[in-house]
């Protein structure tokens, strides 16, 4: 819904509730990316991830994404497992609610 401000300016304000899914980023197998759900927040930019491949990993939010991506419990993210240590991963993408609905409809989420 778009409405005009009453202060006389001609800038419009949108409510943001009617988001449309135009393009959804899916995990790329060639980059070793997996879908994961945030199980718990550990603090200090660290989270516990329940990955779709059945492994529970400790996820790290890189500094470049820290301020831009606010992660909460239950969020669906893309994780990139470390090559050296498979029990750890980097969180590289967070999905919005309409994108999660699209992933469930297409069968990416179980």
UniProtKB/Swiss-Prot annotation:
Instruction: Cite the entry's keywords alphabetically.
Output: Initiation factor, Protein biosynthesis
The GO cellular component terms are: cytoplasm
In terms of SMART domains, this protein maps to:
eIF1a
Q: CDD domains of this UniProt entry? A: S1_IF1A
| Disordered: annotated segments | 1-29
**InterPro entries documented for this protein:** NA-bd_OB-fold, RNA-binding_domain_S1_IF1, TIF_eIF-1A, TIF_eIF-1A_CS
Q: Which PROSITE patterns match?
A: IF1A, S1_IF1_TYPE
For biological process, the GO terms are: translational initiation
* Transmembrane intervals: none
Indicate, by first and last residue, each region the UniProt record lists as having compositional bias (Low complexity): 7-18
Q: Where on the tree of life does the source sit, at the highest rank?
A: Archaea
Keyword set includes Protein biosynthesis: yes
Residue span(s) of domain S1-like: 22-96
Q: Which Pfam families match?
A: eIF-1a
Q: Name one GO molecular function term.
A: translation initiation factor activity
Q: Which NCBIfam families match?
A: eIF-1A (TIGR00523), PRK04012.1-3 (NF003084), PRK04012.1-5 (NF003085)
Q: Which family does it belong to?
A: Belongs to the eIF-1A family.
Its biological purpose? Seems to be required for maximal rate of protein biosynthesis. Enhances ribosome dissociation into subunits and stabilizes the binding of the initiator Met-tRNA(I) to 40 S ribosomal subunits.
Instruction: Report what the protein is called.
Output: Translation initiation factor 1A 3
In the UniProt record, the gene name given for this protein reads eIF1A3
């Amino acid at each position: 819904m778009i409405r005009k401000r009453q202060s006389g300016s001609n800038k419009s304000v949108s409510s943001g509730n009617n988001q449309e899914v135009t393009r959804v980023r899916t995990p790329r197998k060639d980059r070793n990316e997996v879908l994961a759900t945030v199980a718990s927040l550990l603090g200090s930019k660290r989270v516990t991830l329940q990955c779709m491949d059945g492994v529970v990993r400790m996820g790290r939010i890189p500094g470049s994404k820290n301020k831009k991506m606010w992660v909460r419990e239950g969020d669906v993210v893309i994780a990139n497992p470390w090559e050296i240590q498979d029990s750890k991963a980097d969180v590289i993408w967070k999905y919005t609610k309409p994108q999660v609905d699209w992933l469930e409809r297409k069968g990416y989420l179980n």
